[in-house]
Amino acid sequence: EGGTYGQLYASPNLIAANGTWRLPFRGYQRRHDFLRRGASYPEDGEFRWACWEPDRLAGIEAKAEGRVTLIERPCSGRELLLNFRTAPDGWIKAEIVQTIHTPPQPVEAHPGFSLAEAELLTGDSISEAARWQGQTDLSALAGENVALRFHLYKAKLFSVSI
């Protein structure tokens, strides 16, 4: 059951229970600045639980179409694994791009790992490999620093592993 609150006072510890992560909190309808606005102390609030699926506490979301580039990191040479969820008509595509420069400049995709070669990822997966023309192998990039550029449409990206 959802709710909307002006004030939240949360416990500092996540609790694992029934296959979810839970956080107890107390919510009040009044905003945090209620005293400055001349209001009295809030009436009794209510205790609730905020719940998350494991491994999905935070993520990047595109409610329509969006793009994000993550800073460079060493490539393991195995696969690019994604933890994501899309709407029924949503998708994600991944590119592996050259090292990002400062100040920012356009960067090109590594050959074989471009947007044009990327396959759509759809649905809901905790760990699915990105594919480029049916291939997932990144051994050609092993040990190189690469940046990752994701194109999302009605999708949430929770984590990546390269």
Listing of model-derived features with the role each one plays in the protein:
Residues 1-162:
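Carbohydrate-active catalytic/glycan-binding domains of CAZyme proteins
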